[in-house]
């Protein structure tokens, strides 16, 4: 099996993979890795919760079925806001609804050496992305439209935790304290409500959280990353929801679960109480996209003071060390594609290597070397087949000259030659096919790892960005050309011209690839050339 056929195998496999991966975007992934086709049902006009009874404290508080009409109008926050600064986050929380209207990630500058931090949540008109939450029914309790008060306009985390309260009072004696809970070294924000019912009537309460954003797509043709919604349920089913499908999704119920708005490297997730049954929905309003989770309705007795079950928000990067223990299935927001079963162990191995080496560039090189060692025997078989074919090239050319007009005779004589020399031209196929899924998986690992964002290596300042001097793509092109020279030229002149052009085509294509990916390809090519050269030398004596 010569190298030219290997290139064709890679091209065909990549085409099939990209089609499969695109199909997988609109399908559901179960915990066992099975793909479950998504049934689209028109969004209902009401939310029906089927709930179980549960005492929250000594007062008479029970779950009951509820039909709710959420205040869906999206409003731009013009109210005063309170600034909250933790070790990882800087937030602006509007007094209108207690909505987190702006969020910056302190450890992630927008550019290298920039004082400006990456902004994930925003109240800018053309970049709306907010986390809204509130209580229902509207009028009796505060929604994300209601005006809260805050004792301070600025909170700074000085210890290991911080609580930021917002207060709302009704005219008839209902008091609500909405509290945000922050912990050091965490992007998780807890939310709870303390409700005081001083009226003579029972109070029917339902809490909700919704994520709102526009459909700003941050992906491109060279780097195809996912931007859109997602949800996870108690059946361990993870489902992507593309923006154009928001109005077509059915309402679902789940014990626990979560919803999220995802983009490259970062995401925001709303995570309700794991012990309750919640209703999830999505919709499009005025060109903006909403993912909503509604919690069970509660009946609060007159005179009772109750704290509702807490929920959480995750506002931050797709760091595995941060998200692994936040909620079940949250690690699926790191999009490894359809080969996640292979990609996730590779990601964990790469992180483990980094914990020892403390350099992402050298970690990629080390991982490439380990993968090459793991497939050494398979690669050796392929390269031996190539070397054997190279030795037979003059004799095959002579057979073609002799029997060129008789295709049947040429095929017969060619097979006799293979049999005599004990060479199977197809023996190199299996090693290549086995290694391709690993290459594709590592591609997605390096593409999705936020840890590579702005990670330096030698002259490179950011392994997630293209090589600014195009050194690695040029080395990659040269290595491909050198690898071709180790193999016999194709007998067909047209095929030979195509193969000669491939290094130039790939070089141009890789100019815009993240340098971390190109680094992997270059190292892999150099190791392959070395291995093939050694094998050729042994065979040729």
Curated annotation (Swiss-Prot):
It is a multi-pass membrane protein. It is found in: Cell inner membrane. The chain crosses the membrane at residues 7-27, 289-309, 356-376, 430-450, 463-483, 498-518. GO terms for biological process: protein insertion into membrane; protein transport. The keyword Ubl conjugation does not apply. InterPro entries: Membr_insert_YidC, Membr_insert_YidC_N, YidC/ALB3/OXA1/COX18, YidC/Oxa/ALB_C, YidC_ALB_C, YidC_periplasmic_sf. Its main location: membrane. GO terms for cellular component: plasma membrane. Keywords: Cell inner membrane, Cell membrane, Chaperone, Membrane, Protein transport, Transmembrane, Transmembrane helix, Transport. GO terms for molecular function: membrane insertase activity. Interacts with the Sec translocase complex via SecD. Specifically interacts with transmembrane segments of nascent integral membrane proteins during membrane integration. NCBIfam families: PRK01318.1-3 (NF002352), yidC_nterm (TIGR03593), yidC_oxa1_cterm (TIGR03592). Belongs to the OXA1/ALB3/YidC family. Type 1 subfamily. Required for the insertion and/or proper folding and/or complex formation of integral membrane proteins into the membrane. Involved in integration of membrane proteins that insert both dependently and independently of the Sec translocase complex, as well as at least some lipoproteins. Aids folding of multispanning membrane proteins. This is Membrane protein insertase YidC. It comes from Ruthia magnifica subsp. Calyptogena magnifica. The gene is yidC.
């Amino acid at each position: 099996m010569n190298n030219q056929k290997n290139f064709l195998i890679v091209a065909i496999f990549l085409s099939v993979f990209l089609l499969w991966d695109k199909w997988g975007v609109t399908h559901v992934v179960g915990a066992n890795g099975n793909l479950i086709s998504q049934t689209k049902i028109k969004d209902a006009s009401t939310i029906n919760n089927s709930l179980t009874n549960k005492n929250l404290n000594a007062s008479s508080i029970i779950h009951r079925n509820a039909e709710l009409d959420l205040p869906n109008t999206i409003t731009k926050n013009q109210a005063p806001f309170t600034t909250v600064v933790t070790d990882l986050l800087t937030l602006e929380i509007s007094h209108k609804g207690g909505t987190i209207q702006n969020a910056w990630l302190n450890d992630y500058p927008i550019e290298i050496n920039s004082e400006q931090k990456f902004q994930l949540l925003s109240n800018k008109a053309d970049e709306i992305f907010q986390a809204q939450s509130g209580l229902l029914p509207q009028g009796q309790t505060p929604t994300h439209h209601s005006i809260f008060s805050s004792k301070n306009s600025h909170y700074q985390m000085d210890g290991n935790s911080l609580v930021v309260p917002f207060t709302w009072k009704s005219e008839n004696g209902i008091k609500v304290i909405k509290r945000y809970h922050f912990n050091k070294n965490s992007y998780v924000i807890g939310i709870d409500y303390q409700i005081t019912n001083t009226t003579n009537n029972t109070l029917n309460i339902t809490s909700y959280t919704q994520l709102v954003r526009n459909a700003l797509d941050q992906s491109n043709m060279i780097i195809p990353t996912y931007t859109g919604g997602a949800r996870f349920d108690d059946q361990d089913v993870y489902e992507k929801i593309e923006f154009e499908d928001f109005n077509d999704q059915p309402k679902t119920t789940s014990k626990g679960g979560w919803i999220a708005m995802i983009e490259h490297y970062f995401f925001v997730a709303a995570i309700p109480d794991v012990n309750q049954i919640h209703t999830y929905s999505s919709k499009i309003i005025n060109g903006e996209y909403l993912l909503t989770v509604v919690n069970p309705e509660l009946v609060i007795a007159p005179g009772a003071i109750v704290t509702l079950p807490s929920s959480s928000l995750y506002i931050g990067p797709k760091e595995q060390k941060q998200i692994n223990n936040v909620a079940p299935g949250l690690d699926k927001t790191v999009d490894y594609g359809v080969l996640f079963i292979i990609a996730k162990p590779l990601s964990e191995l790469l992180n483990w290597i980094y914990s020892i080496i403390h350099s992402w560039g050298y970690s990629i090189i080390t991982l490439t070397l380990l993968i090459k060692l793991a497939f050494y025997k398979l690669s050796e078989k392929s390269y031996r087949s190539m070397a054997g074919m190279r030795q037979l090239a003059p004799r095959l050319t002579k057979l073609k000259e002799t029997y060129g007009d008789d295709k049947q005779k040429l095929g017969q004589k060619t097979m006799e030659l293979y049999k005599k020399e004990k060479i199977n031209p197809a023996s190199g196929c299996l090693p290549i096919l086995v290694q391709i899924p690993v290459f594709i998986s590592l591609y997605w690992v390096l593409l999705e790892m936020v840890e590579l964002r702005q990670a330096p290596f030698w002259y490179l300042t950011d392994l997630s960005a293209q090589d600014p001097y195009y050194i690695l793509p040029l080395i990659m092109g040269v290595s491909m050309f050198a690898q071709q020279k180790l193999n016999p030229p194709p007998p067909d002149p047209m095929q030979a011209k195509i193969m000669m052009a491939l290094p130039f085509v790939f070089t141009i294509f890789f100019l815009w690839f993240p340098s971390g990916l190109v680094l992997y390809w270059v190292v892999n090519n150099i190791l392959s050339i070395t291995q093939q050269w050694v094998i050729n030398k042994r065979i040729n004596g």
